[in-house]
Amino acid sequence: MNRQQFLIDAGLEVQTLEFWIEQQWLVPDESTQEISFSDTDVARAHLIRDLKGDFGVNDEGIDVILHLVDQLHGLRRAFEELHKDIASSPR
């Protein structure tokens, strides 16, 4: 989705989005002329907004939490691949 649609879906202001991209909390796809965002980016923006607004997490805390979330997703993918390999190997 384009930047304008992302801002609407994520409920963000332009300045907030620019700061979050600068902090690398959001990493949009810049492979085309216009940057684009995914549904995952929207979900991540909602998480950041909730952490900051509802829970009062500061910027350093957001960095730590997002790093841990990214590690968990990476481990999940690794376990899924391992499970596929085990399931497809002859017994």
Label every model-predicted segment.
Residues 6, 12-19:
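Short glycine/proline-centered loop/turn elements that form peptide/ligand docking sites
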Residues 2-8, 22-27, 31-91:
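Arg/Lys-rich, alpha-helical DNA-contact motif
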